[in-house]
């Protein structure tokens, strides 16, 4: 049964979508079968993989509303072994529409049960908020990756997110783990970047991925061409960073499987 990983941080601009798309694509290149669920009404993962959100007829909205099964809305991407459940602007209405429903936090988990055996890993790209859609993602997930940019105020809001994760563990999903904190947008020339790395590693030590995602022009360009970095420029630093992250992620998860 595939492992489900949410990628979450209520701060915007920290590299959530970049990580969701490129970690998923890198695992696909490493011959893992991967599904990416776009659970952000901005639909950035959807457009970053070459789909126009305005033309998406079926996606995460219909899955959360249980109007369609997950398998009915899955689309193939041009990346090896990577499928997508796309998002469209309608997703913004889900927060209001689910509010009065029973088990409203469980909708995504229940929907993904159907496809969990079809994939090695399922990633959920969360919105930059702690609303009902993100709550659904955390309830559906086995673990969560938290991207943190190497910039001023990097740790701002992290305490709030960790408290939300704790309350999800207490109420909805006792098995939710923190997969790791991922440092993004690192620039070795900047003293501040190096200070943030030091501070995060001091505070969170073993929770932090060894792989650090560097600032990279090619990585920033790739989404505007509707491509993952691995398809856009496999030799770039950005592609190599995410391949290294994928290998680190696999090493950790395969060790856990062997010890289980």
Pin down the residues of each PLM region.
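P-loop NTP-binding core
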Residues: 1-260
């Amino acid at each position: 049964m595939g492992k489900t990983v949410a990628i979450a941080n209520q701060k915007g601009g920290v590299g959530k979508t970049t990580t969701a798309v490129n970690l998923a694509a890198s695992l696909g290149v490493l011959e893992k079968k991967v599904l990416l669920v776009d659970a952000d009404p901005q639909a950035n993962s959807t457009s970053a993989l070459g789909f126009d959100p305005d033309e998406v007829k079926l996606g995460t909205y219909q899955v959360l509303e249980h109007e369609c099964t997950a398998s009915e809305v899955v689309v193939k991407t041009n990346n090896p072994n990577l499928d997508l459940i796309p998002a469209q602007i309608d997703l913004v209405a889900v927060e209001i529409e689910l509010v009065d429903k029973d088990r409203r936090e469980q909708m995504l988990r229940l929907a993904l049960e159907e496809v969990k055996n079809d994939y090695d890993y399922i990633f959920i790209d969360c919105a930059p908020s702690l609303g009902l859609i993100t709550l659904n993602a955390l309830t559906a997930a086995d673990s969560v990756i938290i991207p943190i940019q190497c910039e001023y105020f990097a740790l701002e809001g992290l305490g709030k997110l960790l408290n939300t994760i704790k309350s999800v563990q207490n109420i909805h999903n006792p098995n939710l783990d923190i997969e790791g904190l991922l440092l993004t947008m690192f620039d070795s020339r900047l003293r501040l970047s190096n200070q943030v790395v030091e501070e995060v590693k001091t505070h969170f030590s073993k929770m932090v991925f060894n792989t650090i995602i560097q600032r990279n022009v090619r990585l920033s360009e790739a989404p505007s061409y509707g491509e993952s970095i691995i398809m856009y420029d496999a030799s770039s630093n950005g592609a190599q960073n995410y391949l290294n992250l994928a290998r680190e992620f696999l090493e950790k998860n395969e060790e856990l499987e062997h010890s289980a």
